[in-house]
C-alpha cells in the first residue's frame, strides 16, 4: 500500500509568528503560502517549513510531532496504519486546511497527516 504524499513540511515551533516570519521568508525566498489560526496557535507555511506559534502551554501538545505530511487521502493513511501497525493519536479532525490526523508509527516517529481541501491544495502549486 502506497500513500500519495504531496509535500512534507518541517515543523518549527516559535514564540511569535510575526517575529519569526521575516527570517523564514528571507531563508526560503518565498512568501507564506498559508497562514491561519487553529485552536490557540498561529500557523504559517513558508517554503518547506510549517511554523507553529503560541504560548509554551499551547504548543506543548504538539511538540512531539516530528513533521506534517500533506497527503492525497487520509483514508490511505488509515489503511497504512491498519496494515503496518502504529497508533492513531488524534483524528481524523476537520481543520482550517481540510482534514488531519496524527499517527505514532512503529519505531516511534510521530507524524501529522493532512488532506487539504481544494483552496489549501492550490497553495502547493
Regions found by a protein language model. Give the residues of each.
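N-terminal beta-strand motif that seeds the catalytic metal site of vicinal oxygen chelate
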Residues: 1-21, 65-67, 117-125
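Vicinal oxygen chelate
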Residues: 1-3, 7-15, 57-125
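Generic beta-strand hydrophobic packing signal
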Residues: 8-10, 35, 92
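Short alpha-helical
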Residues: 18-19, 41, 75-76
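Conserved active-site tyrosine of GNAT-family acetyltransferases
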Residues: 20-25, 81, 108
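Conserved acetyl-CoA-binding loop of GNAT-fold acetyltransferases
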Residues: 26-33, 85-87
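Conserved short beta-strand elements that form part of the metal-binding/catalytic scaffold
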Residues: 30-64, 110-117
